[in-house]
Design a protein with these regions (language model features):
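Short aromatic-glycine-(Arg/Gly/Cys) micro-motifs in beta-strand/loop hairpins
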Residues: 10-25
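Short, surface-exposed helix/turn micro-motifs that flank interaction/cofactor sites
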Residues: 21, 39-40
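Short, charged, surface-exposed hinge/linker loops at domain edges
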Residues: 1-6, 40-74
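A short, exposed loop/beta-hairpin motif centered on an aromatic-Gly-Thr core
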Residues: 26-35
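A detector of short terminal or domain-flanking linear segments
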Residues: 1-5, 11, 29
């Protein structure tokens, strides 16, 4: 088994739910009611995404994202 590491983004929705997505895997996302469920669901979505790529003999993208928190003062 190969281990994959990906950055995920979790956004709180106006209705209180969460949208989670993996920028390195285009279209890989989930929307659920709570934070913990978002993390579990995006892990499952990533696994399914990678399995689909492999079953179609496609390359699995490498993580190529840099995240930096910046301060903007007005």
């Amino acid at each position: 088994m190969k281990e994959y590491n990906y950055t995920i983004i979790l956004e709180k929705e106006d209705d209180g739910g969460y949208h989670a997505f993996c920028p390195a895997l285009s279209g890989c996302h989930t929307q659920v009611d709570n934070y913990d469920e978002a993390i579990e669901n995006i892990k499952d979505a990533i696994k399914l995404y990678i399995e689909s790529l492999k079953s179609h003999n496609e390359d699995v993208p490498e993580e190529d994202i840099a995240i930096k928190l910046i301060k903007v003062v007005l």
